[in-house]
């Protein structure tokens, strides 16, 4: 079977060369200081490399120092999410972990008996405060977006505990929060905290709609890329393709992809329309100020599309998508029985 991402159509101008990957080793060295990995553990390094390498596509024009902070923040999200997605913690432990992490973001200090990951969380939160400087509004948006993402993890995980898949609209609502687009935008608020954007723009319905469109495009492409990984790890009910395959009137993988691809292209078209209308409604000066944030949404959408076809995080010879059959690594096994497609 050879489905392809190529049915997803992006404007050509959205494609920008990825940033240098050198920031990954910068992050790795500092992560070792927080005891997050053991030096020489090739499997952990491979896992980290193929997760935070997405940053090179999402923030393709940032400096090395900016990329190091972004890389750390992205690493933190994957570390936290992978723990909560696994069987390493039970429900009570997961809820307590969420509460303690939220406390760190709000208070800027550590809870009692902090773990190494919590120390890392607090360090990054307070580094963000330094970078934001006197732009308390930008820092607060970073905090709020981060907390909302943290609080979305358990509800999304719980949505796949039922015998039947959730309705696609319910799944989409949860994924808009959990896929991390607004979280990534929060990182961008820190990096470009000195931009003189009128805060009313960030709160406008059009800007919010563009974030929603971006979230759904990233979510759908991620569902295509991670298809085999989700099947293998039992996370099928958080994958839109598998939801369509498992519902009462099941669709084939080919038909499921057609439905999701059409939805994705519709979100891209809506984003383009909303951007046009937003820019026409503000001054030339404000257009220049908000451009970096709108461009970042485009880099998230097209960058995720490009990165997904290169990372071994989701690669699988048994994937129905030809792009995912190429980039393989012995440390990341996503192979599944073809009969499950």
UniProtKB/Swiss-Prot annotation:
Gene3D superfamilies noted in UniProt: Farnesyl Diphosphate Synthase (1.10.600.10)
Chain ranges for the short sequence motif DDxx(x)D/E motif as given in the UniProt record: 81-86
Motif (NDxxSxxxD/E motif): 222-230
Short name of one Pfam family: Terpene_syn_C_2
Domain of life according to the entry: Eukaryota
E.C. number(s) listed in UniProt: 4.2.3.-
Catalyses which reaction(s): (2E,6E)-farnesyl diphosphate = (1S,2S,4R)-beta-elemene + diphosphate; (2E,6E)-farnesyl diphosphate = germacrene D + diphosphate
Disulphides: none
Biological process, per Gene Ontology: terpene biosynthetic process
Main enzyme class: lyase
Gene Ontology terms for molecular function: metal ion binding; terpene synthase activity
Keywords: Lyase, Metal-binding
Domain notes: Contains several highly conserved motifs that are important for catalytic activity including the aspartate-rich 'DDxx(x)D/E' motif and the 'NDxxSxxxD/E' motif, both of which are involved in complexing metal ions to coordinate the binding of the isoprenyl diphosphate substrate in the active site.
Family according to the record: Belongs to the terpene synthase family.
Known role: Terpene synthase that converts its substrate farnesyl diphosphate (FPP) into the sesquiterpenes beta-elemene, germacrene D and a yet unidentified sesquiterpene.
UniProt protein name: Terpene synthase 9
């Amino acid at each position: 079977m050879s489905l392809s991402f190529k049915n997803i159509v992006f404007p050509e101008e959205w494609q920008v060369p990825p940033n240098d990957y050198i920031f990954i080793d910068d992050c790795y060295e500092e992560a070792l200081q927080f005891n997050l990995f053991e030096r020489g553990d090739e499997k952990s390094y491979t896992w980290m490399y193929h997760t935070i390498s997405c940053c090179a596509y999402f923030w393709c024009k940032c400096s090395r120092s900016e990329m190091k902070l972004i890389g750390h923040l992205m690493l933190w999200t994957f570390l936290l999410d992978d723990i909560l997605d696994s069987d390493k913690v039970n429900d009570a432990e997961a809820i307590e972990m969420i509460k303690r992490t939220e406390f760190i973001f709000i208070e800027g200090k550590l809870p009692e008996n902090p773990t190494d990951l919590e120390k890392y969380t607090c360090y990054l939160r307070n580094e963000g405060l330094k970078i934001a400087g006197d732009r308390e509004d930008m820092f607060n948006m970073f905090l709020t977006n981060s907390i909302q993402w943290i609080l979305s993890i358990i509800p999304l995980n719980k949505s796949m505990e039922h015998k039947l898949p959730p309705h696609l609209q319910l799944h989409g609502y949860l994924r808009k929060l959990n896929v991390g687009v607004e979280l990534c935008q929060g990182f961008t608020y820190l990096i470009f905290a000195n931009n003189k954007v009128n805060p009313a723009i960030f709160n406008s319905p059009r800007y919010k709609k563009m974030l929603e469109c971006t979230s759904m495009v990233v979510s759908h492409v991620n569902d295509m890329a991670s298809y085999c990984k989700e099947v293998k790890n039992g996370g099928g009910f958080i994958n839109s393709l598998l939801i369509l395959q498992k519902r009462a009137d099941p669709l084939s993988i080919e038909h499921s992809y057609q439905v999701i691809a059409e939805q994705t292209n519709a979100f891209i078209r809506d984003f383009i329309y909303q951007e046009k209308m937003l820019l026409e409604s503000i001054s030339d000066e404000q257009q220049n100020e908000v451009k970096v944030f709108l461009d970042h949404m485009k880099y998230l959408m097209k960058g995720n599309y490009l990165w997904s076809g290169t990372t071994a995080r989701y690669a699988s010879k048994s994937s129905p998508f030809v792009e995912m059959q190429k980039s393989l690594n012995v440390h990341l096994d996503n192979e599944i029985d073809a009969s499950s497609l």
